[in-house]
Regions:
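Short N-terminal or domain-adjacent regulatory/targeting segments
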Residues: 1-25, 71-76
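Flexible, glycine-rich loop/tail regions that form catalytic "lids" or insertion modules at the edges
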Residues: 20-22, 31-34, 76-78, 88
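Residues that mark the start of a beta-strand
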Residues: 27-31, 59-61
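Long, low-complexity, serine/threonine- and charged-residue-rich intrinsically disordered N-terminal tails
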Residues: 32-37, 43-44
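Residue-level recognition of beta-strand->loop/alpha-helix junctions
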Residues: 34, 64-68
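Conserved alpha-helical elements of sugar-nucleotide-dependent glycosyltransferases
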Residues: 42-50
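Short helix-loop-beta junction
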Residues: 49-61
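Glycine-rich beta-alpha loop elements in corrinoid/cobalamin-binding modules
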Residues: 67-197
Length: 198
């Protein structure tokens, strides 16, 4: 990580009033990503609520990622400067259609394959959510292992519990993890559903 990125991260953190308590020993690490700049992402109430809900769960610890304002040589969390591939879940909070194009760009910056079908390992699990899921998640379905439909606050605890238990089991089968996640109300797993083309 270059010094410009380190300086940028520290400037943002120094301006914030910390309201979140982190569970540093949490078993499920979440990279919470917003596919727009820091200022746009931090003005999203939904993004902030999800960040709080995740960090309030006893098994979870979430750090934030934003689309780089300047093209840094990679993608790193605001809190610790960790790349997204080191997390169990990469969760995208998507509010606007114009942000769709930044999702594969952010995955590329994090050295994460774009499509769910290209990611064989169960982790990091790439999940989408936000207002886009209220009307039509299909344009982004191929990118995500799972999509949270509707209000995330009601679904996240179950998701974290499933991932926590899966990790404890020592299982490495991504297919089984996706089946387990698909049993949670409000979660859509595109790989387990047929896609239709015109």
């Amino acid at each position: 990580m270059d010094w410009e990125l380190t300086k940028w991260r520290k400037e943002r953190l120094n301006r914030e009033k910390p309201l979140i308590t982190f569970f540093h020993g949490a078993s499920v690490r979440v990279a919470l990503a917003y596919p727009n700049t820091y200022y746009v992402g931090m003005s999203s109430l939904g993004f902030q609520v999800v960040y709080d809900v995740l960090n309030s769960h006893k098994h979870a610890s979430a750090e934030r990622f934003f689309y780089p304002e300047h093209m840094f040589k990679g993608l790193f969390s605001i809190e610790s400067g960790t790349p997204p591939g080191n997390y169990d879940i990469i969760g995208f909070s998507i509010s606007f259609e114009l942000d769709y194009i930044r999702i594969p760009q952010m995955l590329s910056l994090g050295d994460i394959p774009h499509y769910s079908s290209q990611r064989e390992s169960p982790f990091p699990l790439v999940i989408g959510g936000g207002s886009f899921s209220f009307y039509n998640p299909e344009p982004l379905a191929d990118f995500f292992d799972a999509i949270v439909l509707g209000e995330a606050e009601e679904t996240l605890a179950g998701l974290i519990d499933v991932v926590h238990n899966f990790k404890l089991s020592g299982n490495k089968d991504k297919g089984q993890l996706l089946k387990d996640i698909s049993n949670i109300d409000g979660i859509y797993v595109p790989a387990l559903h047929s896609h239709f083309s015109c």
